[in-house]
Every structure is written in C-alpha cells, then in structure tokens.
Amino acid sequence: MASRRRSRELALQFLFSYDLNAAGAGDFDAWMEDFCARFNLSEKNFPHFFTLAQGVKNRWEKLNDLLAESSEHWKLSRMSGVDRNVMRIAIFEMLYCDDVPPRVAINEAIEIGKKYGTDESGAFINGVLDRINKELGGSEADLPENMNTTNSKE
C-alpha cells in the first residue's frame, strides 16, 4: 500500500476516534500520543499522517464550515463519521498541501470512503468535494479522470 494512502487511512482512523470521543474536550497531544503508540506508526507514514491530523484539527471550524456550506440538505451531525472525516482530510489537502493536486485528494477520499464507509459514501464524497473544488476555483481538469463511484466496497 502506498505510504500516502496509508497515512490518510491512519489520519481517518485518528480523526474519526477524536471526533467521536474527544473533539473539544480532550487533550489533542495526549490523544495523538496514545494513538501513535497503539498503532505503532512507521517513520515512513508518520510525517504525512501528522500533517493531516494536526492540520485538520487546527482548521476544524473552517473545514466544518466548508462542509456545511457545500453539502446541501445535510447537517454535519447527519453525515457518517467516516464520510465527514474523509472529506475534512481531502479539503485540508486541497487547501494546504501544495504537493497534492485537488484531483488526487478527491480520488483518494472517494477510494478511502468506499473502503471504510457505506455503499453510498463514494458518490456522496465525490459530490460534496466536487462542489467544494468548484467553489475554490478548481476546474473539471482538477477532478479525477475516472471517477468510479459505483456502489461497490472494494
């Protein structure tokens, strides 16, 4: 598995757990230390994992605002925790990781959402992130070339 994909999956697991259990109430650094010890992150995966986890946490409200504005008829609380956190990671990468093209962030989010989310996650994540990409000034060229958002859970 590619190092960046694994880092994103670990960030999803961390943020999902943090979101459900400690967001706003717990010590982020202690939560991070416990997670890293429990999952024994490799030196290869840690840098991008940490960038994503810390970056999403530091921009939590901004990312939530973008999600809320771009997901018509869906409150954040109604979204699956997996979908919500996959999209936070992708939006963070689209905004703050210059080395990650928007189409890569979107495609990775779709694939990870299909793997860990529901049958509808890929299509839902694609729709919301496509809207956000357009709002941020992205174009069709920024979207994944082959968006296979069928309802399969690879």
From Swiss-Prot:
GO terms for cellular component: cytosol. InterPro entries: NusB-like_sf (IPR035926), NusB_fam (IPR011605), NusB_RsmB_TIM44 (IPR006027). Pfam families: NusB (PF01029). Keywords: RNA-binding, Transcription, Transcription antitermination, Transcription regulation. GO terms for biological process: DNA-templated transcription termination; transcription antitermination. The keyword Transcription applies. The keyword Nucleotide-binding does not apply. GO terms for molecular function: RNA binding. NCBIfam families: nusB. Involved in transcription antitermination. Required for transcription of ribosomal RNA (rRNA) genes. Binds specifically to the boxA antiterminator sequence of the ribosomal RNA (rrn) operons. Belongs to the NusB family. This is Transcription antitermination protein NusB. It comes from Desulfosudis oleivorans (strain DSM 6200 / JCM 39069 / Hxd3) (Desulfococcus oleovorans).
